[in-house]
Amino acid sequence: MKNNFLKILYTTPILHYPPESGPSLRVENSIKALSKISNLYLYSRSSIYNIGGKRALDFYKIYYKNVYFSPLSSFYLPNVFNVFTEKIFRKKILPVRTESEEIYRDILRIADKTRANIIWLGYGNLSYPLLKYLKQNSSYKVVLDTDSVWSRFVLRGLPFAQKEKEKTKIIKAGKAKEAEEIWGAKLADVTTAVSEVDASYYRQFVRKKDQVKIFSNVIDLETYQLGSKKENNRYPSLLLSGTFWPGSPMEDAARWFIDKVWPEIKHKIPKIKLYIIGKGSDKVLNLVDEKQIIIKGQVESVLPYFFNASLMVVPLRFESGTRFKILEAGACGIPVVSTTLGAEGLKLKNNIEIEIADTVRQFASSVISLLLSKEKSQTIATNLKKIVRQNYDLRTLEHQGYEIIKSLL
């Protein structure tokens, strides 16, 4: 499938090894898939230090022909992300820096130097200004690679805002992002979406429907073969995983689960444990004080937690995109209980490959039922693993990438 004459310049504001979050995992898997079908050149808008140093370079070098760093990469991390998180959640998630035309000009210089056929904007949700610059100043084909509908992510937090001032900020930020998504979809040669749910949104704004293509969230199944031996756990355990910051979807999900659902589960299964992992979880939930809730924060590897959990819970009430954690749970052979929104965009059948529950009683009942029935739990887990292997591994992404490239050449 690889086209040795095709050159892609892949540029991203978010790159890290090992992956710290869903976005960085998506970038990693995109690089792996695109390297299988093209000669890939990597342009990082973050410094060597910020992507993980020599360890990261050693990991990525097998996938790219060459790597370039922007002249300002030592000082830059995405500012746009902070604009939204500070307005909505009252917290800057990343150090504030701004991209400049100097970086954009350098990207074009490298595109010319490598004779790239396509410029691929990884984590395109942060790359709209770059998209505009490239289309105004060059004739390159540009792929805007999104991982969600960010305006939905913002606006879905509206029902959970406590104050009118906060609601006003959410509406303003959401509408601003919506406007960006509209002109961005029209301007990009291709806008990618992680699911048909997101794709149907972007297709509203384009003249030709093939300007929007699916480029799914997937996982590299080989990664999940490591350390697969399960420990002998005396008591059942639940796993809650994600990226946390004050007011984040994960904070809301964790607090709803801990305050409302957890007591009902403990009543039926008194010795159960809940493990919470992910960047910021230890800080955001630092006041949670219960021996059976173990909050680990950011961990070096999620694999021991996934492989040894009895069950994964995804109690999200607002978000956008598709959840890597569900795919990871499937790869590791554990069942999942999720809200409808948490499983959005994934082609999974309720009560067959996943358990869907949206109320406190439903969620607690689904968790208890799976924990008390090994046969049911194993069936759900096996079916989920089968779907992940069929539809959500790197081969799927390679095929989708090939179709995107074919439409542009």
Which residues does each predicted region cover?
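A charged, aromatic-enriched C-terminal amphipathic alpha-helix characteristic of glycosyltransferases
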Residues: 375-406
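Short hydrophobic beta-strand element within catalytic cores of glycosyltransferases
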Residues: 325-328, 335-339
